[in-house]
Amino acid sequence: MPHRYLQELTTASVVAAQQRYGSRPAIQRMTANWDTDATFSDEEAAFITERDSFYLGTVGENGWPYLQHRGGPPGFLHVLDPVDGHSVLGWADLRGNRQYLSVGNLATSPRVSLLLMDYAHQRRLKIIGTAHVTDARDSGFEGLLARLSAPGPAGRVERLITVKVQGYDWNCPQHITPRFTEAELSDALAPVRDELARLRAENQALREQARQQPGRTP
């Protein structure tokens, strides 16, 4: 359930929209006893470290939002030690197309939104927080660089980005189209491959038997 997420994002205009469309009383009842802790439980931490991608939203000084996809091996997005009662995320930011839109936006507005998807199980985790960018060449951050560089990003690490979490929310599974990674499909198809191998071997044995019978042509 939301942890300080709706509290941070429910502005006066949002309240007005909820009132207009009739959801305000239900929202108030639903959020009456919600926890406002900004730290992840083991469930969120496990979900985050299992992801191989996420979407990062930033806003430029001209007011335009920007959405970027970030990907890597499972575990490239790290849950670090909490700071002042807030969970902290971190990842090694690699050299990409060198437009630096997200990095430039963060220089003037450190607030970010992250969306983490598990398409196979129709789950998504929304996170908001404040980001801090550290140049990977700066001295004094060797420990953080080593930690965020695991499990081995395929590229040149230019920056270390950490996010102090302000709130998060598990979203409902409605309208999430199931999609599967190559590894997930491989596991699911393993019995099919085994059965296919067995049938091929059985077919080959029958062909050999037929070939050995006089007057029979396989």
Where are these regions (language model features)?
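Binding-site signature for planar aromatic cofactors or substrates
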Residues: M1-P218
